[in-house]
Regions:
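Structural recognition of the beta-strand scaffold that forms the well-ordered cores
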Residues: 123-127, 136-138, 148-152, 162, ...
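Active-site/substrate-binding loop(s) of hydrolase catalytic cores
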Residues: 161, 168-325
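Ser/Thr/Gly/Pro-rich low-complexity, disordered linker/stalk segments of secreted
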Residues: 34-91
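Short glycine- and acidic-rich boundary segments immediately preceding or forming the N-terminal edge
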Residues: 82-131
Length: 410
């Protein structure tokens, strides 16, 4: 076995021991915490489809928006064979690490992908996090392509599985460039016609806190800030974790300032967004002002520099659901509905309408920039999420770039 394989086995054993010991730890944990947009599935509203329906060709199946109900769930398309010569989830460049998928592991993988597939892959830093880590953006495919699709992951710290899946998607399409295809679309043609703009880990500080705890902090000032947030959240009854690293592992979604980046984008009516949290916290604090955080500023500036973007798939965990709409009207609402429907039909995930405004990246891009976006919530287990969840999440998400390309290619 390679050292990384041995680390992966150790990680699984550690997760088993951790889960077995959870009954002894007085901290927040739930079998499935649905994404922050809703309190429970029962509290989510299924919204009737738009009155006018357009059709899109996705994975060889023509779909149309129903008039009165959400799309019927179909069996997830998870049995398609990998492209010839494609690495399996447990092999290749991008694989789960000892702790999950850390920022240094991502940096190492980005460098290896550049070295191996540099003809069709580039990456750059678009800014720095609170604790001084680079925020990377990748271009997969033809950088001069007339159409761009954005893929994002890792905006919430404890949702590091989303970064792993997004990075594996990059390798999947690059390694299968010459021989791979899905639903009648060749990867080579897809990557010639589209530039996929990928932000694999928007919140590197949050990911490192969730995986490696307070020891991952690089600067004394940031450590002092985080220790104060933990003390304040404990005093306010927002956490019952006895140790700060349990607090991070089970709870942490925010950046190193205690701001939830997916509540911090400069939505035109940001001041009206209510999250219920008024000070730095492990989640849902929207910050002192719109786009106050360096991560939010970097992503916003980069998105605006790209020009026209066809759409975005934002990967999160957990819940195995797809969120769409966020209250958008007109043609963008219809296109967002159809995109969400295509993703649901491929993955078998639940289709959820959500008009609640969060000042998320999706809200800002869809409502203010007019770009169709959907949120794909992978996996369905407690935090900290074991890497054993990766295989199932990967099978469901593997071909979603193709689904998006077929959708926007019509």
């Amino acid at each position: 076995m390679t050292p990384r394989s041995i680390c992966a086995v150790c990680c699984v054993l550690c997760c088993v021991l951790l889960l077995a010991a959870c009954n002894e730890i007085p901290i927040e944990q739930s079998p499935i915490e649905l994404p922050e947009n809703v309190q429970s599935e029962q509290g989510s509203e299924q919204m009737p489809a738009p009155e006018q329906s357009t059709q899109k060709q996705t994975a060889g199946v023509t779909t149309s928006a129903p008039q009165t109900e959400a799309p019927k769930q179909t069996e997830a398309a998870t049995t398609a064979p990998p492209a010839t010569g494609e690495p399996t989830p447990a092999s290749g460049i991008v694989t789960p690490g000892e702790k999950g998928y850390t920022y240094p592991e991502m940096e190492e993988d980005l460098a290896m992908l550049q070295e191996t597939y540099g003809e069709h892959f580039t990456y750059e830093s678009i800014g720095k996090s609170v604790d001084g880590r680079e925020i990377y953006a990748c271009v997969v495919g033809n950088p001069e392509a007339p159409r761009k699709i954005m893929i994002t992951g890792g905006i919430h710290g404890r949702e590091y599985l989303s970064s792993l899946v997004v990075m594996k998607q990059i390798e999947h399409y690059l390694s299968g460039y010459d021989t791979g295809s899905f639903g009648g679309m060749r990867y080579a043609q897809m990557l010639e016609d589209f530039a996929f703009i990928v932000l694999p880990m928007i919140n590197p500080d949050g990911v490192m806190l969730a995986l490696c705890g307070i020891e991952s902090v690089q600067t004394p000032e940031v450590r002092q800030t985080l220790e104060k947030i933990f003390a304040d959240n404990t005093r306010e009854g927002l956490t019952s974790a006895e140790h700060i690293n349990d607090y991070f592992a089970y709870n942490w979604k925010s950046n190193a300032n205690g701001v939830d980046l997916n509540r911090n984008f400069a939505l035109s009516n940001w001041v009206d967004v209510k999250t219920g949290i008024l000070s730095p916290c492990f989640r849902n604090y929207k910050g002192p002002r719109a786009a106050s955080e360096p991560e939010t500023q970097a992503v916003s500036a980069y998105v605006q520099s790209l020009g026209e973007i066809e759409g975005m798939l934002a990967f999160h965990t957990a819940g195995q659901v797809v969120y769409w709409d966020c209250g958008v009207k007109g043609a963008v609402r219809q296109e967002t509905f159809d995109l969400a429907q295509a993703v649901c039909e491929h993955t078998g995930y639940k289709f959820i309408y959500d008009e609640h405004l969060d000042a998320s990246l999706n809200d800002w891009m869809t409502l203010d920039l007019g770009i169709p976006t959907v949120t794909v919530e992978l996996a369905s287990v407690i935090y900290p999420m074991p890497t054993s969840e990766f295989d199932a999440a990967w099978e469901q998400a593997r071909e979603l770039w193709v689904i998006a390309a077929q959708f926007f290619g019509e």
